[in-house]
Amino acid sequence: MLNQAFTKASPYKKRARTYTIIWALLIFILCFIPGPDLPESNIPMADKWVHFVLFAVFTFLWMCAGPSQRLSSLLTALVVGCAFGWLVEELQGLLSFLGRNKSIQDIYADSIGSALGVLIFYILAWRAAKTA
């Protein structure tokens, strides 16, 4: 089943596109919750970890929904993930009345998470191709 999920004509691609759109909307919603409404956490840099995971999942889903596993697709997913993270942060800066602010550290967390999502996809696709 794993190797079927990574083929070009996979029936999972359409579902992955839907999940990618839903996940992107979830990122937008979570990133624009007013600052005072956010729960407190004792975990150091908890918000950075949240950004990291959100964008790792986003780029992984993007790759699952994508047309191929070529290097150009991997790079496109990475650029889209980084650009999406940057856009979210820019919008947070513009909408500072929500109690949110633009953070370069969040952009770094988004970008590193995006890279991890692409890497995880590549490793799983490579393993699936090896066992096929």
Question: Model regions: which residues?
Answer:
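Bulky hydrophobic segments
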Residues: 1-104, 111, 115-132
